[in-house]
Each structure stands twice: as C-alpha cells, then as structure tokens.
Amino acid sequence: EGLMRTVIKNCPIALENPEDYDARANLMWASSLALNGLTGRGKQGVWSCHPMEHELSAFYDITHGIGLAILTPRWMNYVLSEQTVGKFAQFARNVWGIVEQEEEVAAKKGIQALYDYFVACGIPMTLPEVGIEADKFEEMAQQAVDHSAIAEKAYVPLDAADIAAIYKDCLTESQFI
C-alpha cells in the first residue's frame, strides 16, 4: 500500500516536471521494490492481470504498463464479490484514503479512483485506443490460461471465458460507481 501511495504521489510530479530528481527517484525505488519479489513474499497465487496483459503485448505491440492500466480496474470490477470485497475496500481506504463504511461502495470507489488516476496520468484506458479490437479475444484468453496458472492459482481463478469477458469490458470507457 505504501508503494502504491508513493507512485500516486510522485507520478504526477514527474509527468509535470520530468527533471524532478526526487519524484523520479521515488518512482524508481517504488518500482524496484514492487518488481523484486519482496512484496509477494508470504503470499500465494498469481496476479491475473499479468498473464492477461502478456497476451495483449504478444499479439499487439503495446507497453506492458499501459495494458495493465487498461485491464486492472476492469479485472477488479469483474472479480468483485463477497470473497474479494474486503481486500478491495482495504485498497480503497488505505491507498486512496476513501472514507466509506459500506464495503462494496468503498471497493467500487477505490476501483474508480484507480481508473481516474490512470486517466489523469494520460494513459489510454480502452483497448481500441491502443489499436486492439475484439477479433482475437478468445484466442488471447485461451493463451493466457495455457501459459499461466491463472485458472488454478490466481487470487480469483479465471477461465478463458472470464478473461475474454474482461477484455470485452476494456473496449469502452468505464464507470464503477
């Protein structure tokens, strides 16, 4: 959560002033910690968005981070359930500072905050904006299942139909609250 707050604080500063050494250093430090495996210690499973995005990057020439930004809020919304609502409400409260007693409302506000943040950073937020249409969704979804443990070991296991549905959700702009 602290790493996410660091990125949320420093990314707009670095975008506004690319010469801001402190903002860039904080982003690099947060990125290093996020990617070195430390944050996953003691946790099980795979994060579903990575294998889903790997297929977008394999089939189309897009940046991994942009694909993740497009997918993540839609994935969160798709898997939002009694099983996940507590974790997503915690994300909303601890990362975004959302004050909301109702768990589902807090979770949806957190998902919306993430989506709006990506928009504010100037990130394309639909697949058509990065040149991806629906014609290969089923094939990419099956590849995501075949090339990962997403169907068995993910936080919320997903099959190819689930993944194709998430891709479809990424065709248009979204509202979560």
Per-segment meaning from a language model:
Residues 1-113:
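Active-site segments that bind and position negatively charged phosphate/pyrophosphate groups
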Residues 88, 95-177:
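C-terminal charged capping/lid subdomain of soluble metabolic enzymes
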